[in-house]
Amino acid sequence: LDEALNAGAWAVEFDYSGFNAAGGGPGSVITPYPINPMTNEIANEPVMVPGLYNWDNIDVESVRQQGQQWKFKSKEEASKMVKKAACFLGADLAGIAPYDERWTYSTWGRKIPKPCKMPNGRTKLMPWDLPKMLSGGGVEVFGHAKFEPDWEKYAGFKPKSVIVFVLEEDYEAIRTSPSVISSATVGKSYSNMAEVAYKIAVFLRKLGYYAAPCGNDTGISVPMAVQAGLGEAGRNGLLITQKFGPRHRIAKVYTDLELAPDKPRKFGVREFCRLCKKCADACPAQAISHEKDPKVLQPEDCEVAENPYTEKWHLDSNRCGSFWAYNGSPCSNCVAVCSWNKVETWNHDVARIATRIPLLQDAARKFDEWFGYNGPVNPDERLESGYVQNMV
């Protein structure tokens, strides 16, 4: 039952977002099976077409040539309207960041799909050898195609602004981490990321502006979200928002529409994270730094999605990813136990306020543990306690 729910939650991400590598872009590709319109028969061989994260801006020129490009009175008005539209189209929070070359990946990539014969007789294009994996032979990845970043070549424009938005994850589901149920809410958010990003891109294109919707690909999301005023970067490497803490997913849409950017905001996250270390204690892979203070990363410290000379707590993404593989589903322990991860109830409002008061910051973690919020912090105790099973 849990696995079926999980599959449904991830369905849009897997079936319609496309082959997006971690380095990401340009755009996305999906592999549906065409239907013969005369016989209504579904073909056994798939075709490759753009997915929801597509960068197809062919309609923009038509809008402009017809003199129908929407002209805003000011960058401020444009920003206000675009954020309002983003939330109407499904975003829970939205902000505007200026395009910053530092956050664009130095190499873009796409998983290389190859045909795999399935038991039902159909051919499925997969980035790994699925029959081999299903027969217990391990995961054999076919590799990645690499692209030099070139906005004008692949999207037809040079970005000026980035619309960054956040989608909330279910509180009750996340607190069961590292269960299949917590994976389901992660998958649901990933699926919604693609849908909402696509809608925002279509909205911009109909106004006569170029757009490139993206998930985790193309550029680093957290620093863009910080620039867009959506929150602060936490010890766990995630964006901490005032409303949801780290319990969300981030997506973004690049555009040539010049928008008034939002300003970064501070509300005590760094000061709190210096003392708390709860996420580091709860990480089963020990991928999160226990150092009291963030540090300026040197080139030798950086992983694929990190920039040198930026100040942050280091996160070992290889350790994190290895536990995901071992666990068989995503782990969200660092999200579940975070003291900023709260819902709108009076006692959680008090706890949220406590995280912003220096004298109470150290106590905020203890309050969580005393009242049993979100289960044991120790990862071994968490799995052995029955908490995950009981929550399901």
What positions do the PLM features span?
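Iron-sulfur (Fe-S) cluster-binding modules
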Residues: 1-101, 105-112, 116-122, 158, ...
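Catalytic cores of enzyme domains
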Residues: 83-84, 89-340, 352-358
